[in-house]
Amino acid sequence: SGYSLFIWKKAIMIACKRHLFNIPRDIIYMNTAYMSPLLNSVSQAIEDGSKLKSQPWRIKISHFFDEVDKARYLFSQLINTEPCNIAIIPSTSYGIETAAKNLKTKKNSEILILENQFPSNVYPWQRLAKNKGIRIKMVSRLPKCTLTESVVTSIHDSTVIVAIPNVLWTTGELIDLPTVRKKCDEVNASLVLDLTQSAGAIQTDFKEIKPDFAVVSNYKWMLGPYSTGFLFAAPQYHEGQPLEEGWIIRKNSKNFSQVNELTGYYRQISETELLTKSSS
C-alpha cells in the first residue's frame, strides 16, 4: 500500500515504503497521528548513540554539536527557514513554555486557543494568563463556518497571542495558517503554533506563515523518537530568555577548557542554539 503526502488541500500518492520500517507484512499500521513507527535508520541511530555512550572514551567535543547542527539544518529545510531559527527541545510543553516566557502581554488582553486543543499548548497559557491577569478565550467552530473562519472571526484588538495547531487533534480539522497570520498582523498579535499533528505530513512554509514561535514533537509525522523536538523562534526573539541557564548555550561553550569562565550571554544563534538546549 502507498502513503499520502498532503500538500495543502491535495494529496500526492507515494510508493510503498514498508521496507524502511520494521513492520511485518501482516500488519497495516494507520495510526501515525497517535504515534509513528520508527524508521529503521532512526532505530539504528539510537542504537549507535547508545553504543557510543557505552564507550565514552570515543566521545569527542564534536559529538555535542555536529549532529545537533545537522538536525537543525534538515528541519529548517522542511519548513523553509534558516537553521539559526531552530533549537532542539525535549517536548512540546517545553517549547510552548519558552514561547510563553518570551512573549509580551498587555493589560486587558486575551490569549486565543481552540476548544479541545491538545493541553501542551494550553496549560502554559493558563499559567501566563493567571500570572499576568489576562484572559483565555477558547474558540469552538461556529455554525456554518470552517475552523479557520471561526478563529479569524474571534481575533480582535484585545487579542495578544493566538496559540493554535495546524490540525486539531480531536477532529483532524485543518486551519489555514497564512490566513490566521494575516489577521494577527492586523491586530498586532503573536502567533504560536503546535505543529506536532502536521509537520512532516503537510507542506509547511514558514516564509509564508511567519509564526512568532512554533513547536514540533518528533514522535508522530516526523518519524522520530520520544523526548525530541524542534522549536522555531523568529529572529526578533533570539535575544530572549531560555527556561534553563545551561552551560552549553553560552558563548564559546565549545571550548571545554573554559566552561567555568563563560561569562558571555547566550551563544550566537547562528553558532548552534537560540533559547534552549537539553543538557546536564
What kind of feature is each model-predicted range?
Residues A11-S280:
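Pyridoxal 5′-phosphate
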